Swiss-Prot record:
Catalyzes the oxidation of 5,10-methylenetetrahydrofolate to 5,10-methenyltetrahydrofolate and then the hydrolysis of 5,10-methenyltetrahydrofolate to 10-formyltetrahydrofolate. This is Bifunctional protein FolD. Keywords: Amino-acid biosynthesis, Histidine biosynthesis, Hydrolase, Methionine biosynthesis, Multifunctional enzyme, NADP, One-carbon metabolism, Oxidoreductase, Purine biosynthesis. NADP(+) binds at residues 149-151, 215. GO terms for biological process: L-histidine biosynthetic process; methionine biosynthetic process; purine nucleotide biosynthetic process; tetrahydrofolate interconversion. Its EC number is 1.5.1.5, 3.5.4.9. It holds the Pfam family THF_DHG_CYH. Disruption phenotype: Probably essential, it was not disrupted in a global transposon mutagenesis study. It comes from Mycoplasma genitalium (strain ATCC 33530 / DSM 19775 / NCTC 10195 / G37). The keyword RNA-binding does not apply. Pathway: One-carbon metabolism; tetrahydrofolate interconversion.
Amino acid sequence: MSFDGKLKAQSILETYKNFDWSKCKLVIIQANDDDSSDSFIKQKLIACNTVGAKSELIKLSNQITQAELIEKIISLNHDVNVTGIILQLPVYPHLDKNSLLEAINPLKDVDGLTTNHLAEIKPCIVEAIITLKELFNLEFNNQKIVVVGLGITGGKPIYEFLKTSGYKVQACDKDTPNTFELIKSADIVFTAIGKSHFFQAKNFKKGVILFDIGVSRNKQNKLCGDINPEGIEKKARWWTKTPGGVGPFTVLAIIKNLWILHEKNKRCLQSSI
């Protein structure tokens, strides 16, 4: 079974219109020339507009230095009109993404990627998985789970969440010798490698649950997931298409986290008066 993630996420997003977003502002910093990022950013800006939050995109050239970008982030940290900051990944090769992420004030970390992010803020991909799990009553207990790919915005936070939650989970990366053997026996598989249609239906067992997290463009410049959809309907019990599967729920998580930060900062301001 697959589903229209965009439609379901949109229906949940509509409920956020009831909140007062007049003093909420999201700033997205883009320091890359990545086509996929353009698509992701567009969806985030549309979501902000839908609920009534302000948003701004700061697009930087490849001439930006590490020091200049950190200075820009610090300036946004101190801007009382900015509620949340997103550093859109990836960044230009000459930039150190980890140092840049750590420069973001945890009180403005919408993505939940800083080391000291607020306890209430989950990484957006994790929040998306939790929402889907609850929405479709997916059972993770006593299931063999495999996460393929350990990127900072995909597989890594998913693996850490599953592990700390006590689920039976294994992680695979490019150095894992028996990845295909592991996923063939898995009940639930998360793919997050960003390689167009790398996995085929034959790689999974009958009745598997599949979360296709990775996004890339094929030779025709079309957005694709890690899993080739051909034959998947007959193999998987439940799966997410890409695009339109997990992605809309990560955007929904951004809006949820932005509101949490707004409320947190409002309480901090009130307590200081």
